Structure formats: structure tokens, C-alpha cells
């Protein structure tokens, strides 16, 4: 019986839907009414009852009263079918003018369980699709061949457009997602190379260390006190020997600042105006940053006009990658005849500061074009008369020089943290806490780096000399062609370094870095005269090492050493060590330090090729100089809160080189010493500011190394706020009104040698190089720095004889409209405005 029941139930499940379909179809056509037709009455009755298989009980059916379920009959209905039935009937009545009329499909839905509607819909859709397909094929077959082809092409074009639109929409959606992610992601610099406290600054800068890739960032100074000095050398020293025209050769007064960065004899005097791979600043900026700067004598005569221009822009493409462009122009016509100078520097730089990789890349171009006049023939024209400077006779009437430098450089470093050591410790000790942060600086780490530099220096000198003054200037020396000179010199330097830095423990440990590197330096020297060109090549392989560390935030130290193993400069070495103590003694300024520093350096170096062997029309020599020994010891004191900086230095020299009064290179046979002390202190007495710079120096052999014993730069001014913001919290316009004076004790100021491109000694004329002073109005207007200077206002006053010489037989700018200089420095950047005031 059980088996027979299961068979009957199965047949019922199969036959029942078919019977329902037949009954509903017959009912739609008026068949089977009153129990007659295709469907027996028993089956029709079962079909009518089938709509009750899906039920929803009213809410009251689930509630219980005191005596159980509420009284009253609960009716089980198919609410879905009832709802749809009422909607269909209403629509049919509306379409038929109020007469109830159901389509076969709707009448079937009335009879069937709602769970079977999908089967009915699939049959209806299939039937409709078949009819539509048959109608389309009949229409399509009735078309001609040309009409079919046209139709197919139209449909294909529509399909291609639809596909293209679909792909475009997909790409747009993907780009929208990327843009939304980028917009929502904070642009935060994350790098191991700089401290966390500097990563959130709006703008930071640093210089590149080619030896070990270390970075020490700082915030650039954009104040009007810094940009008051429009000549770079005036920011670095009390004063300098120079030729009086912006962009012309410079030699610092302070002997300790004369150390050459490039190491090229004819380029040393031009270094202060341009950049090198070691002095070029790199930047990281949160917003685009641009500097526009102009210093010049707009109202002066065109022949004497000075025009200095500075254009700079930098921007971070990403928080890690920065790109910058620079153009500097210094120059002017000068006071004397034929001393026009044009000094241009262009640079393109990029840097990347990543979590495990840093990179610095750049190109620097410097060109200096200058008319060489050899200075005035007789300085009494300045000391004893008041004639126009253009009427003073000059020494060289037809001479000029041109210097070019092109430098490419690359420095890169890879950080390799030894996280496996920490993981091993954590696996052995469950209580050990391991920090998986990739920027964790307190673990053992290795840094592998490489730096490369390719630099070419060229100098061309030309003159035509036919008078006695010009011949006497060069001691009547014409080795190759009398009366005419065309000398060329070229130095090419290729320096490659590979190093590894090891951080044994933390980046702030007593020994935080241990460094080791190797390098190769290739140099070539070229002399070209109208008769005999020469070329010399040399190569040197060297090793170098270093170490550094700190104790908390109070003591810092570092040491480095370099030794040339093989090659032209074999045996040369350089050792240096630095120490600094930082104390914070000020109760009201906890973060303002008092810094004490010490530096020691000793080096032994071979004289370069041009000092040993040189051939030109006016000078030639072949020397066998011994190595040069230099040892220095310096101490520094810095107290920013007191606006005080001081330093002392001692140097012991042996075998040092100098150019004598004839312009011939010489080597000092006996040891000598240099003692130096400098101080800068600004006194503030209400609105009165007394900014004093003083330099004391002593040279044990003035014939070899002449130095001024005393040099002064005094800037005294009144400072006041001319305008404040509406809320009174910010200074809108700050003004300074005062004078800037220069003076030094009498000394034999060096002379300029145009043929060699160096300063040489002279022992005929003593100079005090002053006093001369500029009267100025200096302003800080919001971000802009603006000044107006009336240069050399005294022009010899209060001395009996004028002495505003900048070098032997060269003068600085004279007063008048030619000395009225206007300067403006304007940085452009965006900065956060903060939350709106409530």
C-alpha cells in the first residue's frame, strides 16, 4: 500500500499542472462551464482549492487571549495572488471600457498557484519570442541583397558603438574609483631619510651628501633680514675681495671659508655665485612653491646698470617625489669701462624620498662672460679726484673671458632593515614585542648607496694688446704670439662612489652609523694655445669610512676619513671629526638651544695639474711641488635667543701654494699659521637694532697669505610695524630704516689676474676698503621682501681720501642714480587657512 500511495502521489504531481493548464485554457474560451467540458468537476474543484496552498495568517491569528486563541474564523488566503488579481482586473476593465475581460495568460494566473507563475511566464515569453523571431525572419528574407547588407552594417555599427560606450563607461567608473581613493588618501610623506618632526613642514630643504647620502633638512629662510643681502657672499662672510660687479670673481676675507668645493683652479673664485652637487638645495613641499626675485639699478645709466634675477619653482608630484627648476642671473655694466659681467646659472633637479629608497638627480649649468679691463691704471683717480668712473684709464682695452660649467649628478640609496633578527627574537621569546613597521628606525639596518658626478669646466681667455700699459700688466710676457692671446683650459671630472652604511642599533644610539665606501676619480686637463695644445689624464682609486652617533638630544658627533690607495694622487688623505653639545637653559624658551661645536680636520693633498704644469701665452711653468699639509681646529658658539654667533679657528699650513706679485704659482717653503676669531651679535634696544659682524685674523706670513687683521660689517637700523591686520594679531608691514657699513684695517688687497682667472698677491698699495656704507629702507610686506638702497652714500666720507675699493684697482658702485638699487623678493605658495573663526 505504501508503494502504491507513492506512485499515485507522483502521478498527481505530474498530471495536476497539465490538467490545470487545460482547464484554464478552456475557461478562457468559454468551455467547461457548469461541470461540462474538458475538465471533470472533481479536478476543477481541486484546482480552485489549490490557491490556498500559500497562506499568510492575519496578525490577530497569532495573538492569544485569556482563554486561548481569539474567537472568530481565521481565513487562509493567497494574499499575493489576490493582490495581483485585483490589479489585473482593474487594468482590464480600464482597457475594455468597464467590461471585465481577462487574457488567457491572466486567467491562467487566476487559476494557478503563484509559485507556478514563473513556469507560465517562461511559456509565454518563449511563445512571444518565437512569434517575434518568425516575424523578423520573414521581414529579413523579404529584403534585397543590398538592403540586407545595409541593415547588417547598421546593426554592426550600433553594436560597435554600444561596445565602445560600455568600455568607456567601465574605464570612467574605474577612474572615478581611483580619483575618489586618491582624493580620500592623505598626502603624507613617509620616509626613513628625515625625522618625523620635519615631515609635516610645509617646505623643507637640504643639501646632498655624496659620501653617505645623509640628509639634514631645515626650513628655508624667507625673511627680509636674510634677503637684504642680495649678493650670496655677503650672507656667508663679513666681506670679501671682489671686482665690484655682481657675478664677478670673489675671494672671502675669512680664510676658513676659502676652501674650494670644486677643486678647479680657474673656477674657485666663481663658486659663491653658483651651485654644485654638494651645495645645491633640494626641496620637499606640501604645496607648489615659487620664488620671483629682482635686484637692480633701474634708474641708473644703461651702461652701468646692474640687473640680477632669481626665478625658482618647486613642486611635489607625489609626497615622495619633488621636481624643481632654477634660473639665476647676476651681472651689470660696472663703474669702470669694459667690465660688463654676465653670470647665469640654470639647474634642473629632482629627488625621491621613499620608505626604502632615496634618490637625488640634477643638472647644473653655469656660464660667466666678462669683459676684462685689468683694473684702473692709477688708483689716485679715485683717491684724489671726483671724475666719472668711465673716464678713468683702464689697463686692458680689448680682453675678455668666458667660463662654462656643466654638471650631471646622481645619488641613490637603498635601505635594508634587518627585520629577520627581530622576527627570530619574537619566535624564541613570546614576551618579546616586534614592531613590523617598515619605518621603524630602531632596528639594525643597512644602507647601500651609490653616487656619480660628471662635470666639465672650460675657460677661454682672449686679448689684443698693443699699448705699454697692457704689456707691463703681463710683464711683457708673450710666449707664443706677441700682441694677441687665445688661451683655452678645460677640466673634466668623473667621480663614482659605492658605499654601505650599517646602523647597528638605533638611529639615535651612541654609535648610530658605521660607514665604508670606495670610489674612483678621473680627471683630465687640457691646455690650448695657438701653437701647442696639451692633454693630461689622471685616475685615482680611494677608500673612505665614517661613523656618527648621539647621546639623547644633547650631544652629537661624527668622524670621517679618506685615503687614496692607487693612482695619480696616491698617498693623499683627509681626516675630520665634529662634535656638538646642545643645552636648553632658557626657562621661557625650552626649545631654544645653546650650541657649542668643535671641528678638527687634517689633510695631505697633491697639488693639481694646473699648479704643476701650465702653458699659455702670458704664463707657463713646470713645477715639482710637494704635497700640501693643512690642519685646522675650530670652535663655534650659537645662541639664537640672544642673536649671538661666535667662532674661533687655528690653522697650521705647510707647503701651501700662492700666486706671487708676478702671477707665478709658488710653494711656501716654511710652515705658517692662521688664527681667526669672529662674532656676530645683534643688540635690540626698543626699535633700535645694532647688528654687528666682526672678524679678527692673524697670518704669520703676510707676504704669502695676506689677510686683513680687522674686518667689520655694521648694520644699524630702526625697526617698526607700519601696518597690522584687522584683528591686530599679525604684522602686515614691517619696516627697517638705517645704514649698512663696511670697513677693514689696512692691508695689501689681492689683485685679479684675468689671464689665469685667479687672485694674486700685490705689495704696492694698501687698502682699507672703506669705510663705505649704504642707506636703506627694508620692508617685509606680508610674504614679500622689498628694499631700496642708496649705495655708497658717503663715497669716501668721512675719510680724507676715498677708499671704496673692492680689490686692487677695482671699485664698488658709486653713489647717485647708478647706486640707487631696488630689490624685491616674492615667494608664492598656498598654506592651510585653518578652521573658520566662530
Q: Predicted regions span which residues?
A:
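Membrane-proximal, glycine/serine-rich, low-complexity loop/turn segments characteristic
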Residues: 31-406, 416-428, 584-591, 813-817, ...
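Exposed, low-structure sequence patches enriched in small/polar residues
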Residues: 33, 285-287, 292, 395-838
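Terminal non-domain segments
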Residues: 4, 17-18, 343, 389-393, ...
Amino acid at each position: 500500500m505504501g508503494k502504491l500511495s507513492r506512485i499515485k502521489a507522483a502521478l498527481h504531481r505530474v498530471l495536476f499542472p497539465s490538467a490545470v493548464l487545460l482547464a484554464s485554457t478552456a475557461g478562457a474560451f468559454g468551455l467547461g462551464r457548469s461541470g461540462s467540458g474538458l475538465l471533470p468537476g472533481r479536478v476543477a474543484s481541486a484546482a480552485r482549492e489549490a490557491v490556498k496552498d500559500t497562506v499568510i495568517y492575519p496578525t490577530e491569528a497569532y495573538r492569544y487571549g485569556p482563554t486561548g486563541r481569539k474567537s472568530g474564523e481565521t481565513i487562509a488566503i493567497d494574499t499575493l495572488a489576490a493582490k495581483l488579481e485585483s490589479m489585473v482586473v482593474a487594468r482590464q476593465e480600464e482597457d475594455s471600457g468597464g467590461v471585465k475581460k481577462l487574457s488567457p495568460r491572466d486567467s491562467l494566473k487566476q487559476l494557478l498557484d503563484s509559485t507556478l507563475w514563473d513556469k507560465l511566464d517562461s511559456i509565454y515569453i518563449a511563445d512571444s519570442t518565437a512569434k517575434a523571431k518568425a516575424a523578423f525572419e520573414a521581414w529579413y528574407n523579404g529584403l534585397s541583397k543590398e538592403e540586407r547588407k545595409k541593415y547588417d552594417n547598421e546593426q554592426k555599427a550600433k553594436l560597435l558603438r554600444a561596445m565602445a560606450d560600455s568600455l568607456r563607461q567601465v574605464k570612467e567608473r574605474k577612474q572615478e574609483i581611483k580619483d575618489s581613493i586618491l582624493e580620500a588618501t592623505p598626502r603624507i610623506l613617509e620616509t626613513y631619510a628625515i625625522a618625523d618632526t620635519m615631515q609635516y613642514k610645509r617646505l623643507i630643504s637640504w643639501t646632498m651628501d655624496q659620501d653617505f647620502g645623509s640628509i639634514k633638512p631645515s626650513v628655508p629662510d624667507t625673511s627680509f633680514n636674510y634677503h637684504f643681502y642680495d649678493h650670496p657672499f655677503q650672507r656667508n662672510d663679513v666681506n670679501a675681495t671682489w671686482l665690484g660687479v655682481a657675478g664677478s670673481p670673489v675671494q672671502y676675507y675669512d680664510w676658513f671659508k676659502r676652501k674650494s668645493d670644486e677643486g678647479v683652479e680657474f673656477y674657485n673664485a666663481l663658486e659663491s655665485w653658483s651651485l654644485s652637487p654638494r651645495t645645491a638645495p633640494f626641496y620637499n613641499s606640501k604645496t607648489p612653491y615659487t620664488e620671483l626675485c629682482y635686484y637692480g639699478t633701474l634708474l641708473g645709466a644703461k651702461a652701468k646698470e646692474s640687473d640680477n634675477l632669481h626665478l625658482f619653482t618647486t613642486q611635489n608630484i607625489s609626497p615622495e617625489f619633488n621636481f624643481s627648476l632654477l634660473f639665476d642671473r647676476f651681472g651689470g655694466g660696472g663703474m669702470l669701462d669694459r667690465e660688463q659681467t654676465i653670470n647665469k646659472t640654470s639647474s634642473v633637479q629632482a629627488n625621491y624620498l621613499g620608505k626604502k629608497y632615496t634618490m637625488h638627480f640634477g643638472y647644473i649649468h653655469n656660464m660667466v662672460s666678462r669683459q676684462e679691463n685689468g683694473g684702473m691704471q692709477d688708483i689716485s683717480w679715485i683717491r684724489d679726484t671726483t671724475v666719472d668712473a668711465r673716464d678713468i684709464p683702464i689697463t686692458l682695452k680689448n680682453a675678455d673671458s668666458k667660463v662654462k660649467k656643466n654638471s650631471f649628478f646622481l645619488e641613490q640609496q637603498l635601505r635594508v632593515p634587518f627585520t629577520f633578527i627581530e622576527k627570530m627574537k619574537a619566535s624564541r621569546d613570546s614576551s618579546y614585542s616586534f614592531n613590523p613597521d617598515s619605518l621603524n628606525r630602531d632596528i639594525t639596518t643597512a644602507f647601500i648607496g651609490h653616487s656619480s658626478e660628471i662635470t666639465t669646466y672650460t675657460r677661454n681667455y682672449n686679448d689684443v694688446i698693443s699699448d705699454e700699459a697692457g704689456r707691463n700688466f703681463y710683464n711683457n710676457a708673450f710666449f707664443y704670439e706677441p700682441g694677441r692671446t687665445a688661451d683655452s683650459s678645460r677640466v673634466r671630472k668623473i667621480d663614482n662612489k659605492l658605499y654601505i652604511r650599517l646602523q647597528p642599533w638605533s638611529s639615535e644610539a651612541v654609535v648610530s652609523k658605521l660607514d665604508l665606501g670606495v670610489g674612483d676619480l678621473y680627471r683630465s686637463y687640457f691646455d690650448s694655445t695657438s701653437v701647442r695644445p696639451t692633454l693630461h689624464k689622471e685616475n685615482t682609486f680611494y677608500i673612505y669610512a665614517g661613523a656618527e652617533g648621539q647621546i639623547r638630544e644633547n650631544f652629537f658627533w661624527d668622524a670621517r676619513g679618506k685615503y687614496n690607495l692607487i693612482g695619480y694622487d696616491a698617498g693623499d688623505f683627509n681626516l675630520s671629526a665634529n662634535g656638538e653639545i646642545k643645552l636648553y637653559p632658557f626657562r621661557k624658551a625650552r626649545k631654544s638651544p645653546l650650541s657649542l661645536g668643535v671641528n678638527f680636520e687634517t689633510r695631505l693633498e697633491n697639488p693639481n695639474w694646473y699648479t704643476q704644469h701650465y702653458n699659455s701665452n702670458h704664463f707657463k711653468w713646470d713645477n715639482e711641488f710637494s704635497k700640501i699639509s693643512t690642519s685646522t681646529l675650530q670652535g663655534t658658539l650659537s645662541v639664537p635667543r640672544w642673536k649671538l654667533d661666535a667662532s674661533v679657528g687655528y690653522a697650521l699650513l705647510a707647503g701651501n701654494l700662492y700666486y706671487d706679485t708676478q702671477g707665478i704659482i709658488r710653494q711656501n717653503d716654511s710652515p705658517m699659521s692662521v688664527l681667526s676669531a669672529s662674532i656676530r651679535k645683534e643688540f635690540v634696544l626698543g626699535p633700535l637694532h645694532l647688528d654687528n659682524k666682526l672678524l679678527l685674523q692673524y697670518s704669520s706670513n703676510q707676504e704669502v697669505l695676506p689677510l686683513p687683521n680687522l674686518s667689520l660689517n655694521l648694520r644699524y637700523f630702526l625697526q617698526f610695524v607700519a601696518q597690522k591686520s584687522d584683528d591686530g594679531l599679525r604684522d602686515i608691514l614691517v619696516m627697517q630704516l638705517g645704514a649698512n657699513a663696511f670697513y677693514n684695517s689696512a692691508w695689501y688687497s689681492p689683485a685679479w689676474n684675468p689671464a689665469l682667472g685667479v687672485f694674486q698677491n700685490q705689495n704696492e698699495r694698501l687698502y682699507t676698503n672703506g669705510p663705505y656704507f649704504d642707506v636703506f629702507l627694508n620692508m617685509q610686506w606680508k610674504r614679500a621682501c622689498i628694499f631700496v638702497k642708496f649705495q655708497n652714500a658717503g663715497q669716501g666720507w668721512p675719510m680724507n681720501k676715498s677708499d671704496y675699493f673692492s680689490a686692487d684697482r677695482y671699485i664698488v658702485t658709486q653713489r647717485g642714480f647708478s647706486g640707487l638699487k631696488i630689490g624685491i623678493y616674492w615667494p608664492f605658495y598656498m598654506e592651510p587657512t585653518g578652521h573658520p573663526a566662530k
